[in-house]
């Protein structure tokens, strides 16, 4: 069972939300944040990317930078740019992209559920990234940014969400840059709060979609605080961390593609011949070719597109990891032919989120920066959940979720 609770969110006043809200900390670098926050003292970047308040080149992991985050968080509250709600609520956060809307419930997720596997992971985390986020949670004593969860589809929750979203929202705006819509409601009726809590309690699992490092950091700080408190009861606010939970059937994972600098000493002809061992290779011409389904790949090389279809026997349908197209392409193309053993560390490979389109792959190859591009059919939510349920970990750079959660719509304090 998944334990959740409502919380007293800290939020911007309605007329300030567009100035406060920002992209998540990990989708842009310090210089990009500096540009986006220019002339806007109310931008959340002053809290989640506080190095922008220091001279260019300041180490973002400097202790003074973390301290600045806490100072700015307090300043935002003192100035009334962030205000805490009087009572504990759940919240509904809707995101609209390309005419499609997904509706998430903003809740306090339970730290022990993360520790005991009710909250399921599909990705490995790096200790240095965990420690960075842990410091941020500690100094602010808050989850400034939410994590992104999926839950099994639930008709009763759908009905509650439908009821509230028929009413006037608290926030409703289009984000600059990407043009995605962000809409927000407060779930404040006690009977609805109770029903949401009950429905989550019936769920065997919740799934981290995006935000593995934030989840790990929030849970580790919560456990740390429990250990440090001699009067720990288990119901304190630090036992919970902020998550936006979406029904799995509303979520779309988009493709996460690869570009490689060279052919590992092979000529284009030799490379295509080598591919023929494990794939049916078909030339598709100069028009962009998109993978048509699982086990079909799109290759761009020397101004031409190719279809690659994995031959029978090159993958195992009964292996939840082995059947993934990222595994097939990593093993049979990147490793076996191109000599790329470690996707995380090899400098010859880069990754391009599908949000940029296959035209971005063509552009990077045509520019001469890269030699070859490989586009993959996206992973399904069912595959992600099956892998998490079996305790497996997806290969690196497998999932790309879009739209990203906007930060700054609501914050969860740990006391």
Language model features by range: what are they?
Residues 1-415:
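Surface-exposed, charge/polar-rich loops and edge strands
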């Amino acid at each position: 069972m998944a334990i959740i609770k409502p919380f007293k969110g800290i939020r911007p006043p309605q007329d300030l939300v567009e100035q406060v809200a920002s992209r998540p900390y990990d989708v842009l670098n310090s210089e990009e944040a500096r540009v986006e926050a220019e002339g806007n003292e109310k931008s959340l970047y002053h809290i989640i990317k506080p190095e922008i308040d220091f001279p260019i080149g300041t180490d973002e992991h400097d202790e003074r930078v973390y301290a600045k985050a806490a100072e700015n968080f307090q300043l935002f509250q003192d100035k009334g740019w962030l205000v805490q709600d009087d009572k504990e609520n759940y919240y509904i956060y809707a995101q609209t992209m390309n005419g499609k809307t997904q509706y998430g419930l903003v809740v306090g997720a339970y730290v022990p559920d993360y520790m005991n596997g009710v909250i399921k992971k599909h990705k490995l985390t790096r200790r240095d990234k965990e420690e960075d986020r842990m410091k941020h949670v500690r100094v602010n004593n808050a989850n400034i940014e939410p994590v992104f969860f999926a839950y099994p589809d639930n008709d009763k929750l759908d009905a509650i969400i439908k009821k509230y979203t028929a009413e006037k929202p608290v926030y409703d705006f289009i984000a600059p840059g990407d043009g995605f819509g962000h809409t927000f409601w407060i779930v404040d009726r006690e009977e609805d709060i109770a029903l949401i809590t009950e429905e989550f309690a019936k769920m065997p699992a919740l799934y981290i979609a995006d935000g593995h490092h934030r989840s790990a950091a929030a849970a580790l700080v919560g456990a740390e605080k429990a250990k440090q408190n001699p009067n720990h009861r288990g119901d304190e606010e630090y036992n919970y961390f902020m998550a936006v939970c979406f029904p799995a059937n509303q979520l779309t994972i988009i493709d996460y593609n690869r570009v490689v600098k060279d052919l590992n000493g092979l000529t284009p002809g030799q490379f295509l011949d080598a591919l023929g061992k494990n794939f049916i290779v078909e030339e598709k011409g100069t028009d962009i070719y998109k993978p048509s389904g699982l086990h079909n790949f799109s290759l761009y090389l020397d101004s031409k597109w190719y279809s690659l279809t994995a031959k029978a026997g090159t993958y195992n349908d009964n292996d939840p990891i082995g059947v993934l197209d990222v595994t097939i392409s990593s093993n049979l193309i990147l490793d076996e032919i191109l000599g790329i053993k470690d996707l995380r560390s090899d400098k010859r490979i880069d990754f391009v989120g599908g949000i940029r389109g296959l035209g971005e792959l063509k552009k990077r190859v045509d520019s001469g920066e890269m030699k070859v591009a490989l586009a993959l059919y996206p992973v399904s939510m069912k595959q992600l959940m099956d892998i998490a349920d079996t305790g497996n970990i997806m290969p690196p750079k497998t999932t790309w979720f879009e739209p990203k959660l906007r930060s700054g719509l609501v914050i969860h304090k740990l006391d």
